[in-house]
């Protein structure tokens, strides 16, 4: 079960993602108290995991095609301010470069007031989903749409 999007993962973020008209992806999500490192702060690894997830989902949002996949080659995260848990945060991912073999994305985590808390640049190698998921139960690992009433972020 995915630690970021897995709806059945009780210890994960269970983060929803929204494809935007400009080809970016957005998320309204909240870290939980069991995601802390120091009191009042989210663990840096979980911040990086969200930065990574938004990059791949930005590819899907740009092309409106969830059959496109890749695996992370490099991840450069910058921690700007402490990221709190138990509060709604805003995530955004945007594709910045694409080739036949790879793609790159910039991802951002903001508080509700628009203050940048963390951001990152991710490079991915394109890889077919059947190679990535070989031998796995893919229910939580593959995207599927869930209807909701969100109309604006």
Over which residues does each language-model region extend?
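Non-catalytic linker/capping segments at the edges of enzyme domains
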Residues: 1-34, 140, 145-153
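HotDog/MaoC-like acyl-thioester-processing domains
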Residues: 84-85, 96-153
